[in-house]
Amino acid sequence: MVTSPELKAYAQAARAAARALSTASPRAKNTALLAIAAKLEAQQEALFAANREDLEAAQAAGLSKAKLDRLRLDEKVLRDLRTGLQQVAEMPDPVGEIEGLQIRPNGLQVGRMRVPLGVIGFIYESRPNATVEASALCLKAGNAILLRGGKEAWHSNRALVGLMQAALQEAGLPREAIQLVPTTDRSAILEMCHLADLLDLIIPRGGRGLIELVQREARIPVLAHTEGINHLFVDESTDPGCAVQIALNGKTQRPSTCNSLEKVLVHQRIAPVFLPMLAQAMQKAGVELRGDEATCALIPARPATPEDWQTEYLDLILTVKVVNSLEEALEHIARYGSHHTEAICTNHHAHAMRFLREVDASLVLVNASPRFNDGFQLGLGAEIGISTSKLHAYGPMGVKELTTTKFVALGSGQVRD
């Protein structure tokens, strides 16, 4: 594929900006972050107006309630973004840190210095708040970012990137460090995937189709943020009331997010007690239950189809299965899980430890809601996504995960024998 001159020019400008940003002082970067936060507040009405254009077009196009929820900018979203920017500004700057310094027998001091990755291509769907979060993290880590957002959020993203570029300039940093690809045409995704000489990493964040397209086409390393087909296993030894509260929070607190609960696996010995309690709580919350044959025999639920076990709903729908043992639960998760978030409710220590060891996911929890798979909740500050790839980063990607290390050696005239 031939890259369009316009997109290539944007990538070249990002490359030049990345070189400048890699040597920027922590003070300059933090000044820019705080300026972005101030502009989010000062330009709130203009941002709401741009977002209304996107919401009206999305509603006319028949977008789902879950997608509309992710698209919406309101006072709480902007307040959370401002808080996140302030927290990122307060975090230690990892760039230039030297880790693992050791003195070799010949007196040579060897360590690893943390450095920016360079230029990040961020391909994502209808979440304008991700525009700010991703840009802030890349800025703090000394990276330039080339954003390709979804067409649903075009007006919102343009407004957000415009104010962030103004903040960069005010801080004496290149405005090209944060750029929005000037088209929502799908061909731009393929073009970005082929910019191996200009982009250092691509992070796709969205549905299965987008992730698979980028992984198939990219000539650049990819850190995938895939869908969250997240399970809760309710072990026979658990407190059923506690398990119901965890399931309820996981499903209903914000069902449109990738760390929400989609499936519940219930040990057969506790199912007769737990499932009626679960059904009552979910019915009150407006959640549609689907289940296997054993579940449907115990509570009112729609019979689950084979597709249900491999579907991320991002909606008030929950699929339930009764299993015979911990082993069966582990096998089910290995088959249908998406390596995102998995949880167990149990009072059995050995079962908890086995679940932690054997489940392959970016976050595995014991007696806690899957909604905790989030950069802020895990102490990272904001996140650019939750990596379900194992190389370089696994789990929420904060500032440190957007850097790499190079070896450095400090000598006093040593030569090799």
Curated annotation (Swiss-Prot):
- Molecular-function annotations in GO: glutamate-5-semialdehyde dehydrogenase activity; NADP binding
Q: Which pathway is it part of?
A: Amino-acid biosynthesis; L-proline biosynthesis; L-glutamate 5-semialdehyde from L-glutamate: step 2/2
Q: Which GO terms describe its cellular component?
A: cytoplasm
Provide the E.C. number(s) assigned to this enzyme: 1.2.1.41
Q: Reaction(s) catalyzed by this protein?
A: L-glutamate 5-semialdehyde + phosphate + NADP(+) = L-glutamyl 5-phosphate + NADPH + H(+)
Judging by the UniProt lineage, the source's domain of life is Bacteria
Keywords on record: Amino-acid biosynthesis, Cytoplasm, NADP, Oxidoreductase, Proline biosynthesis
Q: Does the keyword Transmembrane helix apply?
A: no
Q: Where does this polypeptide localize?
A: Cytoplasm
The biological processes this protein is annotated with in GO are:
L-proline biosynthetic process
Keyword Isomerase set for record = no
Broadest EC class?
Answer: oxidoreductase
Q: Which CDD domains does this one have?
A: ALDH_F18-19_ProA-GPR
Q: What is the similarity comment for this entry?
A: Belongs to the gamma-glutamyl phosphate reductase family.
Q: Read off the NCBIfam families from this record.
A: PRK00197.1, proA
Q: Which PANTHER family match?
A: DELTA-1-PYRROLINE-5-CARBOXYLATE SYNTHASE (PTHR11063:SF8), GLUTAMATE SEMIALDEHYDE DEHYDROGENASE (PTHR11063)
Job description of the protein = Catalyzes the NADPH-dependent reduction of L-glutamate 5-phosphate into L-glutamate 5-semialdehyde and phosphate. The product spontaneously undergoes cyclization to form 1-pyrroline-5-carboxylate.
What name has this protein been given in UniProt? Gamma-glutamyl phosphate reductase
Look up and give the organism this protein is from.
Meiothermus ruber
